[in-house]
Amino acid sequence: MAFLISALLILIGYLLGSIPTGYLTGLHLKGIDVRQHGSGSTGATNILRTIGKRAAIFVLTVDLAKAMLAVILVKLWFFVESPEMIPLEWKSWLVVFAAIAAVLGHSKSIFLNFTGGKSVASSLGVLLVLNPIVALGTLGSFLAMLSLSRIVSLSSITGVVAVNVLMFGLHQPLPYCLFGVIVGLYVTFRHRTNIIRLLQGTEPRLGQKLQQEGS
């Protein structure tokens, strides 16, 4: 029973992460598939480029919330149910598995043929529940780099570094540290085309559009 319930909680995490907020926003507000515009991502940055600021704020907020909910549901389970259902020792690991599932769902949504965003907002949403101090430190590093460079992708990668420094520096539980490493590598991989443009000096700054649609 413990394995079945754990699998269900992880599945719920994935399905929550898979809710295609950016895609639905583009469809509702402009009648477009945002995957065919800008960077092709359904995340808030591409929504900002293709639709506008208010839509981007909405998408960012919902993407944060759905990832937070995926983790909160696991924590609530251990709060309201008897440890006999799922061993208490599983808690940190199950929280992290559900968190990773939510992050994966955001970028590989089952509702969008396994396409989606780049999992930055969903990762931050998870961190806000796992450890708000780590989340705020990560957000601070992101905003600091953004203010200096005006490049979202570079700021996101800076945030990845900050997550891992803070997780290990604050001696967080092993599952949380592994979350930082695994998701950090995944988010960096999702930004591989951005990294190429950064090296070429062609990565757009905040407010600019890509020179080539779908790039």
Swiss-Prot record:
One GO biological process from the UniProt record?
phospholipid biosynthetic process
State where the protein is found.
Cell inner membrane
What pathway is this protein a component of? Lipid metabolism; phospholipid metabolism
Q: Which InterPro entries does this entry report, sorted A to Z?
A: G3P_acylTferase_PlsY
Q: Which reaction does it catalyse?
A: an acyl phosphate + sn-glycerol 3-phosphate = a 1-acyl-sn-glycero-3-phosphate + phosphate
> What are the record's GO terms for cellular component?
plasma membrane
Q: Name one GO molecular function term.
A: acyl-phosphate glycerol-3-phosphate acyltransferase activity
Membrane-crossing residues?
1-21, 57-77, 85-105, 126-146, 165-185
* E.C. number: 2.3.1.275
| Keyword Cell membrane recorded | yes
The UniProt entry, under Pfam families, shows: G3P_acyltransf
Alphabetically sorted, this entry's keywords are: Cell inner membrane, Cell membrane, Lipid biosynthesis, Lipid metabolism, Membrane, Phospholipid biosynthesis, Phospholipid metabolism, Transferase, Transmembrane, Transmembrane helix
Instruction: Name residues in a coiled coil.
Output: none
Stated membrane topology is: Multi-pass membrane protein
Q: What is its main location?
A: membrane
Which HAMAP family is this protein grouped with?
A: PlsY
Function text: Catalyzes the transfer of an acyl group from acyl-phosphate (acyl-PO(4)) to glycerol-3-phosphate (G3P) to form lysophosphatidic acid (LPA). This enzyme utilizes acyl-phosphate as fatty acyl donor, but not acyl-CoA or acyl-ACP.
Tell me which family the UniProt entry assigns to this protein: Belongs to the PlsY family.
* Subunit-level organization: Probably interacts with PlsX.
Q: What is this protein called?
A: Glycerol-3-phosphate acyltransferase
